[in-house]
Amino acid sequence: DAATGEHGDLLDIIRESCGLVDFHDVADEARRFLNLPRSEQEPSPNSARPPAQTGSPEAARRLFAMSQPMMRTLAETYLRNRGITPLHEAGALRFHPRCYYRPDDYSPTEIWPAMITRVTDLDGRITGAHRTWLNPAGFDLVRLGKAPIDTPRRAMGDLLGNAVRFGVATDVLAAGEGIETMLSLRCVLPTLPMAAALSANHLAALLLPPTLRRLYIARDNDAAGDGAAIALTERARSAGVEAITWTPRRGDFNEDLRGIGVDVLAAALRIELIPQDVARFMHVDAAETG
């Protein structure tokens, strides 16, 4: 589960809910649950894939592989309720209808639907995953569609220097903290490669592609966001990369998207872009706004 690195099939659920350890006992309980006859040749416990280490990249890869395409799921509804549309990010975003959540080591496991995003390194290898547990009851202005639990967002795997990536960066990249923040910017700049580092500390430590020439930093409008932008700017410039910081009017760019609308956001970003990047990355309608 989310705490052990084992994610989501029937055997996992039976083992967790019944407190079983031995594979034969779990298999027997599964047969009883499904009204299946006992097979003549029992499967060997050694044939089962061993559980991945808690929080490891392998656990993250398994979780992402077990998730399903996002379109026409609660994850798509969640993003649309956050103002994020159209969606072009089918590769990085997936959905798990029954993703395990455990508040702490001493609490029982809960099951909630979740948006699953992959974290990758500069070569595109999956190094981690991020989970946003969702509320199947719908959207509200307090939780914004996230599940009513203590920590509805959690990441796992090797995160430092890596990111949730939208598009493949070569010479130009936009980077920020949150997934929804960067997806909000993709509504205006649908072909600009972007990276969500998942936190201010990780944004400051983001590894930059060796071919990068210009970096747009989409900071959050708080002290942590300011510190991350300063640190990343210094690192970029020391590597010979031009760094330009974008600051939202509100707390982050998703708040801007929902509060001022896509047209006003596009007009604000247009004047922050290098002229050739307007023609290269901004949607024609957005580029003509204002």
State each model region's role:
Residues 102-210:
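Phosphate-handling DNA/RNA-contact segment within nucleic-acid enzymes
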Residues 85-110:
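Short, basic/aromatic recognition patches
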Residues 38, 98-106, 139-140, 254-258:
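Short, solvent-exposed polar/charged micro-motifs at secondary-structure junctions
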Residues 1-86, 223-229, 234-237, 243-244, ...:
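Non-catalytic accessory segments of DNA primases and related replication-initiation nucleases
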Residues 1, 14, 79, 117, ...:
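Terminal peptide-recognition signature
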Residues 5-10, 21, 139, 170-174, ...:
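TOPRIM fold recognition
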Residues 93, 164, 253:
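Short clusters of hydrophobic/aromatic residues that line enzyme substrate/ligand-binding pockets
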